[in-house]
Amino acid sequence: MKNQFLMIAFILVGSVFYTAVSAQSLSVSDIENSVKNDGKYAILVPNARYFQAAVMTGKELKTNNPKMDFEIVLISAVAKDLATDESLKSFIEISEKMGVRIVVCESAMNHFGVKKSDYHPSIKTTPDGFAYMFGLQENGYKTISL
């Protein structure tokens, strides 16, 4: 009986360590390369700095995977920044060129007094950025909120 207990304990402990080791056996590049060529990805962004980073991520991913869907959903203060900060114009143009969709929350626009006409023509809007993200998830998008 004691031997059976020790054997079961050994198997359980061994399987835990094996699982942990095998989960970390992938290299960083293996993990990055697991992004699907035809995948659907979205990032929820609250500020200009994260918007810039999201655009550059979208550019990199779309360069390697042109069929990929990539969206950036903007909430909070970046809704105002996108309309007023000239330094963001080049990021909007990169997004348009690469086929990265930018969607701005109309609730944030209303809060900051921004109109759709204040934006670049390629910018889309949604009544509620959070509801839009839920919709993307329901449609198979992998999402990140910053």
Residue ranges, per PLM feature:
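Bacterial Sec-dependent N-terminal signal peptides
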Residues: M1-L26
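Secreted/extracellular ectodomain signature
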Residues: A23-L146
